[in-house]
């Protein structure tokens, strides 16, 4: 089976964040995308939601510069802003003014735990895929610090880290509310997890209908295509 790539599924997570913002009628809502890479999620958020201020946080210089150029070329400087920062330092540094004020935080963090056995822990690919500069708990903690009460945190990760995600969420006051498992094709073992947490939310978890990415012929499923509309 073809492997689900991280970037293909992130719009599903993103659109759920947009639905939350629209449902609340937050014309002046704020959104932050952690591990933003080249900034595609803030750009899509600017198109799909009514958030007035959208921020992206990226640790790698090259990706950060590309994200800034994209905003400039699209004339979105009034709504979208990027910060070059490690997630562990963001809420006490450049992002201190955003603490407890954000409505929606999204995050597509590195999936692989630790640096054990890595030959080049500083390469761009390694930083993007492995927890070299920050761990899972750091991303959850940062989201909790940014969100206002009842704000929503949406994360993409691997099913193997589900327990770690839930433990970190409760540790920092983010209650898991919705969970969706994603598989490459119908009937195959899920390899992606979508989770929605709420700051100070009640203790009730809803399992959403599983999502398949590909049809038997290799094309995207209708449900996934709808995420891109």
Task: Give, region by region, the residue ranges found by the protein language model.
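Generic structural signal for residues in well-ordered beta-strands
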Residues: 1, 80-82, 176-179
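S-adenosyl-L-methionine
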Residues: 1-26
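A general structural signal for well-ordered alpha-helical segments in protein cores
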Residues: 13-16, 38, 42, 124, ...
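Conserved SAM/SAH cofactor-binding pocket of Class I
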Residues: 21-118
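Mobile active-site "lid"/loop adjacent to the S-adenosyl-L-methionine
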Residues: 109-138
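Conserved Class I SAM-dependent methyltransferase catalytic core
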Residues: 133-190
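SAM/dcSAM-binding transferase cores
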Residues: 187-229
